[in-house]
Design a protein with these regions (language model features):
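Interface amphipathic segments
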Residues: 1-324
Length: 324
């Protein structure tokens, strides 16, 4: 969501004896609508004994939510809170052909678990939550996330398929993603295998840490689509059609990302300042902190004329590109 958007929020609460009915309404003022209502009825009680503990039984009522102009339904479900333990009974957030379902126990016990079940959920919804908005992701995720011991030493494993996985609107293919929570980071260690059928394959390994707001990913490219770089080259190149083979590391804070490594590139693109199209047929691009460099590379135009070039595109964390 646009960070400059205005969000309106209202909370209505009605208490009667040991019962509390709460309704939360929210909305925004942007061209794309985010808004809706969450309604609950909570009943409170205390355990018996010398040190009574507050317990809560919460009924989640059916309501509607709009995300990115799309209507979703919150279905009836139940949550119980008892002695620091949370029991979730079939929370369901859905629309035709898509859903997010949560069921299980959130406790300090190693034997208790919670399952998050996804079907065709837009991956950008998830990344919006952790404020990772410098890179735009797309695709529909299906699979399960298994959670254990959440309130003590979290244990998380996931296996997701992402249909039409895209980065900065550049289609990467079908993604098979495996993830495991690492308490030492803390963050998610992942392996993603991404394939465009009969075109390319890409393997990504490394970690993403929402807490540190940082990532470190090793990218093994085999004819990988480079459309994902289009936003960073705006004003210099346009109509980019490029694929790469090689090894690249993407690392840094979410706001201070950088690349290093080396790839061989096939490229056809318009150089805006020259108003002409240039090509690399299969040449090396050398990548280091703040720089993409060519060394005596052969460039072609679309008529087959060629010449040699040595130069570099320099940047500051993928912003403010200049060429030398």
């Amino acid at each position: 969501m646009n960070s400059g958007a205005m969000i309106t929020l209202s909370v209505d609460a009605e208490a009667e004896q040991d019962r509390l009915k709460t309704t939360i309404n929210w909305g925004n003022n942007t061209d794309v609508t985010y808004g809706g209502k969450l309604a609950t009825v909570a009943r409170f009680s205390k355990t018996k004994g010398r040190s009574p503990i507050l317990q809560a039984d919460i009924d989640i009522l059916p309501t509607e939510v709009v995300l990115n102009d799309t209507l979703w339904n919150i279905r009836s479900s139940h949550v119980a809170i008892d002695s620091g333990r949370v029991y979730i009974d079939n929370f369901l957030f859905e629309r035709p052909g898509q859903y997010l379902r949560v069921d299980g126990k959130i406790t300090k016990e190693e034997t208790d678990s919670c399952i998050v079940d996804l079907k065709n959920v837009d991956v950008q919804y998830v990344l919006d939550i952790v404020k990772f908005d410098d890179v735009e992701f797309g695709g529909l995720a299906t699979g399960k996330v298994f959670l254990k011991n959440i309130l003590n030493k979290p244990d998380m494993k996931t296996r997701l398929n992402v249909h039409n996985f895209a980065v900065n609107k550049g289609l990467m293919g079908e993604a098979d993603i495996k993830g495991v929570w690492d308490n030492e980071l803390p963050g998610i260690r992942l392996q993603a295998d991404i394939e465009e059928k009969n075109l390319s394959s890409t393997r990504v390994t490394g970690y993403v840490s929402p807490k540190l707001k940082a990532l470190d990913l090793r990218i093994e490219a085999d004819s990988t689509n480079l459309d994902l770089l289009t936003p960073y080259f705006e004003g210099i190149f346009s109509e980019l059609d490029a694929r790469a083979n090689g090894l690249v590391r993407l690392h840094g804070g979410f706001k201070t990302l950088d690349f290093e490594g080396g790839v061989r590139v096939k490229l056809d693109t318009k150089v805006d300042i020259l108003n002409t199209y240039l090509q690399l047929h299969d040449d090396s691009v050398y990548i280091k902190h703040g720089e993409f460099a060519l060394k005596n590379a052969r460039l072609f135009d679309r008529e087959g004329n060629s010449g040699r070039v040595t130069g570099a595109l320099r940047h500051k964390h993928l912003k403010n590109l200049t060429y030398h």
